[in-house]
Structure formats: structure tokens, C-alpha cells
From Swiss-Prot:
EC numbers for this chain: 2.7.2.3
Species in which this protein is naturally found: Sterkiella nova
Pfam families registered for this protein in UniProt: PGK (PF00162)
Name assigned to this protein: Phosphoglycerate kinase
Binding site for (2R)-3-phosphoglycerate: 24-27, 40, 63-64, 66-67, 122-123, 169-170
List of residues binding ATP: 214, 219, 238, 313, 344, 375-376
Origin superkingdom: Eukaryota
Xref: Gene3D superfamilies: Phosphoglycerate kinase, N-terminal domain
Any GO molecular function: metal ion binding
Protein residues bound to Mg(2+): 214, 217-218, 375
EC supergroup of this enzyme: transferase
Binding site for CDP: 213, 218, 237, 338, 343
Amino acid sequence: MLSKKLAIDHIPHLIKGKRVLMRVDFNVPIKEGKIKDLTRIQGALPSINYCLENGAESVVLMSHLGRPDGQRVEKHSLKPVLPAIEDLLKKKVQFLDDCVGSEVERECKSASKGKVILLENLRFHLAEEGKGVINGEKVKATKEDIAAFRKSLTSLGELYVNDGFGTAHRAHSSMVGVNVDTRAAGFLLKKELQYFSKILETPERPLTVVMGGAKVADKIQLIMKLLELADELIIGGGMAFTFNKVLDGSNIGKSLFDQEGAKIVPDIIKKAKERGVKIHLPVDAVAADKFEESAATQLVDLKTGAIPDGWMGLDIGPKTIEQNSRVILRAKTVFWNGPQGVFEMAPFSKGSLSMLDDIIKATQTGATSVAGGGDTVSLLGKVKGTTDKFSHVSTGGGASLELLQGKQLPGVVALSDRQ
């Protein structure tokens, strides 16, 4: 049970005078030495500040950045992140150019008076992920190297805080290998667990799930699991055309068709019927003659008409928007994963933007709304001022989807249980 795990605000009395080792997610986009999006760094601030306010001797921050595959790659150094952390924390932060080893251990052990230290990229070492690539060859870290790496990390703190939800589904050394007595979730991780446990364990009903994206096959496990939880399921985006073709035999022109996913559609419909879940598919679509913003478009009624050969469906139409709106506005819990159309192009963004508006309206009238998945989160990022109108926007694409599929997250399992 997610709610049984120890969190940082359960242990203020244990923080005083302790060296805190904190796993954060500073995997931020950097271009020409400049950070393009500060969201992840800002997200870690409440946990860092809480430790400092409660008298931590020091806070040592560790993170990965990019995929250096177990080698030191300068463009993946965390050093460019330092000025942003100092600016946001309004205090000096010491940067160490490694994350383990005798020199790092010495610096971290002697840090005092609320000092904050940022370690170099964890993934510069093979032992963080347990594998990597050297000279184009895939290599694995030895058991001895992994044990030594974890021992060195463990010595850097007396208390461990995990605030890196984005990699909690990976059994990496910084997630599962820090062997101290007290291992707690930071505020960011706690919030993620709170909202996902609400969906998984105690949802207010009706619970409506909105699925989008391209392929059915990619999300089959997720859809099957969500059919055990949901009352209503809205299917949109590219994957909807696979459902339309299989179920109605409709001509979908050059729209996305997922050959593998098509084989699974009857199983999804069967399970939905067994569980009494209402599935809502598009009844009309905006079709285009090419995959471009300047394409010619036409509205197609999917019940009576067909998408012409050579044309492709790139968004849901007004009748579907209306249908979805009714479903969303009666929901008490909404989980949104995947846009309704090609929202990056203005002529095909209406379906996704209407969905966004409806979920915000539902939230304002008391529903719990959770958004997850890269495309959905980037849509919210594009439309200013929408993120904070959701109950929760998840920071962990893969981690949140694995959690919803009923899988255990190694980074969460490794946390101490509440007494």
C-alpha cells in the first residue's frame, strides 16, 4: 500500500543534526549551458528547504542527467544546474565533480551548519544503472563495483530522502542501494504516491479514464488494468481509429492503424462488458489530406460516413467533443493519459484543448484530476496557467504508468514503512 510509506514530514525530529542524502530529479533540458525548464528543480525545493528548516547538518543532492551510459560525458554534467539551485535556494551550494569516492566522502562527512552539496551525475558510473555502453559495446557493472558504489553513496548521509519519482520504477543504486536506517519520501514523491493511491485504492466515483496517443499495443497492459478500476473510458487520439476499424469496419483512410493492437481490441471490449465499464469512442473526426498544418480538412461522421482514401483523421470532431464533455463533467475522479489529436498543429488541437477545459471545469466543481504521460504534460505546459488547475500533474511518465499497471516501484518499495 502506497499510503503506508514513511514521508519526510513524519520525521522532523529525526532530521535535526543529521546529514541528509537526497535523491532528486534534476534531469532538466539544457541548451548551450542554459536550463530550458526549471520545473524539476523547483519541484525539489520544498523537500530541501524542509530539511534545512528542521536543522539538518547538511543536505547532499544526487541526480542523473541525460544518458551518459556509465561514462563521464561533459555535456551531461550537472554543473550547469548549480547557479539555478543557488538562485532558487538563495544560498551558496558546493559542487563536487564526482558522486562517490574518498574525496567526496570526506567533503560530505565534514559538511555542517546547513550546507548544501550537489554531486556530479550519478550515471557517470556504470554501477548506478548496473549497465552502460563503452566504445559502442554494451557492458554490465560487476557485483563488486555495484556494492562499492552503494557503500560509498550510503556513507554520504545518515538519513535518506527520495524525491525522484521519475526514476522510481528503476532499481538503480541511488533508488534502492542506500542502506541507512531511515529512508523517507520527499514531498514531490509523497504527492505522487498520494494521488495515485487515491486512483488505485480509494477513488471517488465515477472514475473516468481518458486514453489517447498512437498505439493500442503500447498501452494494452495499462488499459486492461484501468478497466478493473474505471467506470468510464474515453478513447481518443490515433489509437481510436484502430478501435473504429475493428469494431465498425469503418474505412479510416490513411489514419493510424495499429496492426498488433487490432488483435487485442476484442479482448478490451469483452473485459469492459464483463466489468460494466462504458467505453466512449469518437463519433466524428477532423480528417486532413496530409500531415501538415496547412492541410485541407473535412469533418467526417464516423457513424454514417468514412475517411476518404489518402486522408487521415488527426483530431476528434465537435459531436465527440460534446459527448466527451458530458462524460467528464459527471466524473468525480479523472485520469488523463494521452491527447485527443495532433495538438501540436493548431487545426487539430481543438479536441485536446476542449478536453483540457472540461477537466479543469470538473476539478473546479470538486472532482480529483490527475494528468500523466509525456504528451499530456507537454500539452499542459504549452497552455499557460493550466497545470495548477489540475489536482495533480505527474512528473514521472514511466513510473506513473507502471504504478497504474499494478507494478511495484523499486524506489518506493525501498522506503521505510511507517511505524
